[in-house]
């Protein structure tokens, strides 16, 4: 079972289209799940994949706090980050690095080094 939480309706629609094109079933939940206990729709979650959530301090603090709690409960938490200022300096182990092509319309360079981190401890 794959559950995806996305509060942006355009991104949720893109997730559904991507899943359909790839022949997979994804349950899209269009609500903010940060901080919720692992029960109900979240029961049985064993891995959380998150991308680029440390772009502003309030969001990063809220998300990272919840991710640390999940990791302490045995959930594997992987976080993709392109070098944002509010990424924590501790409690992470590097899992992978990628050079991601970007658009100069959106970024200040054509390639952005991006790291996938695993929450630890």
Can you annotate each of these PLM segments?
Residues 1-121:
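S-adenosylmethionine-dependent methyltransferases
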């Amino acid at each position: 079972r794959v559950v995806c939480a996305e509060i942006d309706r355009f991104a949720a629609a893109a997730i559904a289209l991507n899943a359909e094109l790839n022949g997979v079933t994804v349950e899209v939940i269009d609500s903010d799940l940060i901080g919720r206990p692992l029960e109900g729709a979240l029961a049985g979650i064993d891995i959380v994949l998150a991308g680029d959530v440390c772009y502003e301090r309030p969001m990063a603090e809220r998300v990272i706090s919840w991710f640390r709690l999940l990791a302490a409960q045995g959930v594997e938490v992987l976080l993709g980050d392109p070098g944002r200022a509010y990424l924590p300096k501790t409690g992470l182990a590097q899992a992978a690095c990628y050079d991601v092509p970007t658009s100069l319309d959106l970024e200040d360079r054509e390639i952005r080094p991006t790291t996938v981190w695993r929450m630890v401890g």
